[in-house]
Amino acid sequence: MMLRYALRSVRARKAGFLGAFLSLMCAAALITACGTLLDTGLRGTIRTERYAASPVVVSADQYVRRTTVKHKKGKTKVKHKAKPIAERAWLPESLETTLARTPGVARVIPELTFLAQPLTPAGTGGRTAYGHSWDSAALTPYRLVTGSTPRAASDLVIDRDFALRARLRPGDRLTVQSTQAPRVYRITGIAAPTTPVDHQTSLFFSAGEARRLAAHPGQVTAFGVLPAKGTSADRLWQAITTALHQPTARPGTATSLSPTAPLGSTAQVTSGDARGPVEFLDAATARTRLVSIGGAMGGTSLLVAVLVVVGTFVLSVQQRHRELALLRAVAATSGQIRRLLGREALIVGTVAGVAGALLGLPLGGWLYDRFVALGAVPATLQHTTGVVPPLAALIATALGAWTAARVASRRISRIRPAQALAEAEAGAGAGAGAGAEARTKAGTKSTRTRLTTRAGLTRGRLLAGLVLLAGGVVLVAVLSKLRTEPASTPVTFLAVVVLSTSVALLGPLLVKAAVLVLRGPVRRSGPTGRLATANLRGNAVRMASVVTPLTLLIGMTCTVLFVQPTLGDAAGAQAREGVRADWVVASQGPGVPAEAARQLRARHDIVTEVVRTTVRVGLDKYVAQGVTPAGLTRTWDPDVTAGSLDGLTENTAAVSELAADQLHLKPGGTLKLTLGDGTPATLTVVAVYARGLGFGDLTLAHDLVARHVDNPLASSVLVSTPRTQTQLVTTLREFPGVRVLAPTAADSLQARRQQANAEVNYLAMGLVLAFTAIAVVNTLAMSVAERVREFALLRLAGATRRQVLRMLRIEALSVVLLAAALGSGIALAVLTAFSIGMTGRAAPSVTPLVHVTIVAVGAALALVATALPGRAALRVRAVTVATARE
C-alpha cells in the first residue's frame, strides 16, 4: 500500500524530485568512475610483450618482506608483510645452470634490460626505450627483416616501428644514451616482433656490449624458460618451482602452486598474466597508486554526495511541508510518513543510480585515459570494467537517498499534527520571510517556540553540529602533526568535508548571525534590501541548505589548488637556499652521464653529481639522493644541525631532521636500509640536516646509489667554478641534450615537474569539485523554484519584477559572502595546519588572484542559478499563481 502510494507520489511530483534526481545521478556517476579506477588497480591486467614467447619467467623478488611474530594470551600470531622496491632487482647469472638441468626445459634465455635512449629528433613516439642483448630476441620473439645481427660492440639492431618513425635503415649511424657516456652505433639490422609490442622500443646490442651497458656484472634481469616438446606451461612452472625451492626459504614465502611464487631469497617464478608485472615494474607499482587514488576519490565523493543530497532532500521536504502536515492531520502516523519519504527516496535513488552508473562507465574510461596522459598510470596497465563498480554505486546511491530522506523527515514525522499544520500555515504565502516573522510575534508563547525552532536549530542538530565542529578541530590539530605527504593528504580533504558538514548542521545559526552583521549595509539598498534581510532571517533553514554546498565548493577548491603550492614553494625555497653552486647542469634526456662530470673536473671545476632513488627502512619508504662527497660543501648546503658532511662515504649517510625523529637517529647511530634494487645496507649516520623538504630524507654517497638504480645518470650536476656559462657549454658540447643553467632556472625546471605531479591531484579532485558545483546550482534552483507563490504575493502587494529580481540578487550575494567567509576560513585553517606539519611554518601559499577567482566563480554560479529560475517564476501572472491550488 505505502509503496504504491510512493510510486504515485513520485509520478505526480516529477518536477519536484528533479533536483534530487540530478544530485543522485551525478553522485552515482562519480562513484562508478572512481570504482573503475579502484577495480583496475585490483584486477587490471598487465599484458606481457617482451616475454610473450616464454611461458615461464624466472626473475628476482621485487618486494621487501618482513615477518612479525606476536605472542599474546598464549597465542602466537604471525604476520607477513611486503612492500615493492623502487628499482629492478637482479638475479645471479649462475642460476642458469640450475634451470637448464630442470626436467622439461628445452632452453634457458638470460635477459638483460637496461636504459637505452636513442637521440633522434623523431624520438620514440612516447614509448620507453630499452636495450637488450640480441641473444635474448627469441623471448618475444623478434626476427630480422633486413640486415644482420650485431657482432661488434658498435653494432646495433633496432625495431621496425622505430626505424620507420626515425627513417633509419641498415648502415645509418645512431647515437644512444645508455647507462654510460653517449655512443654512436652502426645500425646493422632491423627486427620486427611476431606479437604486438605497443608500449616500448627495443634496441639490440651485441652480447658483450649489452653486459657493459647493463652495468651488473655476473647478474641478469630475468631468465626466459622455453619448454621441451610435450611439456605444458603448468608442468614447466611446477618443475622449476621444485628445482629452485630451497629448505632455507624465508618464512612467509609462497611455496604453493600459485601463478607467482617467491622462492629462496630472491628468485620468483611467474607464468601467464603474472609475467606482465615482471616486465613492466611501473605498471605493477601503478596498481597500488590507482587503488589509493580510486579509494580516496570514491570516499571523498561519497561523503560529499551524502552531504549534498541531505541538503537537497531537506529542501524537498520543506517544499512539501503543507502536504505532509495534512497527512499527519488525517491520522498518518510518524512511521508511515518516514516510510513514505524513504520509499520515495529509494525509487528516485534507484532510477538515478542506474542512470548515473551507466554514465560513470565512460567517465571512468576518460579518467583512466587522462591519468595515462599525465604519466600517473602507464598504458601497460589495462583499464578494467566490471560489474562491481556500477552495482556498488547503485547500492550506495539508493542507500544514500534513503538515509538523506530519513534525516530530512525526522522533524516533520515527530511533531504533533496540529503543530505541523500551524507551521505549514506559518510558512505559507509570503511567509518566506516577513510573514513568518510577523506570525511568530503574534502567536502564543508555545507557538512562538515551535515556529522559532522550525526556523532555527533543534537541540539534536545543534549538538551534532558542535560534535562535528569539534571533530574537525581535532583533525586540523592532527594534521599539524603529520609530516609526510601520504599521511597528511587524506586527512586534509577529510577535515574540509567534516568542517563543511558542521556548517550544514549549524547553518541556520550561522545565517542568522550573518544577517545581524549584514543587516545595516543591506537595508541601505532600499525596500528590496529590507525584504531580503527579512527573508534571510525568517528562512534560515532554507538558506543554510544553499550555503552548505557553496561553502564546500569554495573550501574544497581552495584546498585543492593551494596544497601543492604550499608544499612546492617550501621545498623550492629550501632548494634555492641550499644550492651554493654557480651553475647546474641538467639534461633533456634521461640524465647527465658521469663522463660529463669527469670532463668538468678535468678543468678543475668543483662538481657534485646528484642521483635520486627511493629506499626502504624496514617497510617505510624514504626519498634518497646520492651525492659525490668531494667538495660537497662548496656546492651544497642542507643546513646541517648535527654532525658533519665531511665524513660522508659509501659506509655512511646523512639524514633529515624528519627522518632522524622518525627513526630515532643521531650522528654515530646505525641506519639499516634496503637500497632501490633490494640490496640491504648498514650505514653509520654522520650528519643531520634541516632542509629535508628540498633535498630528500636521506643523503648517501653517489657511487653507492648509482650501483643500485636502473638509471645511474645524474639528475643534475652542481658546478662551482669561476668559468662562464659559455665556457661550460663548450666543454660539454659532445653530450647531446645537456644544458647549463643558473640555479634559479634549474629551480624553475623542478617547479615544472612538481606542477606535472600537481595536475594529477587536480584531476583527481576536479570531478568532485564539478559535482559540488552542480549541487550548488541545483540547490539554489530548487530554493528559488519553491518561492513561486511568495513572488506572486509580493507582486500583488505592489513589487515590480525588477524589485523581486533585485531582492533575489541581494539574497544570493549575501549567501555568497557567508559561504566565501566560511569556505575560505575552513581552507585557511586546514592549509595552515598542513603547512605547519609539512614545512614547520604556518605559511600556506595562497595566491590572492586565484582566491578571488574562486569566489567570483561561486558568485557567478549563485547569481545564474538564482536569476534563471527567478525569471521563469515571474513569467506567470501573479493572480494566477496566488489563486491556484498548492
Where do the model's predicted regions map?
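Juxtamembrane segments of multi-pass membrane proteins
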Residues: 493, 497-499, 503-661, 667-670, ...
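Membrane interfacial helix motifs at helix-loop boundaries and amphipathic/re-entrant anchors
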Residues: 37-53, 253, 260-261, 273-303, ...
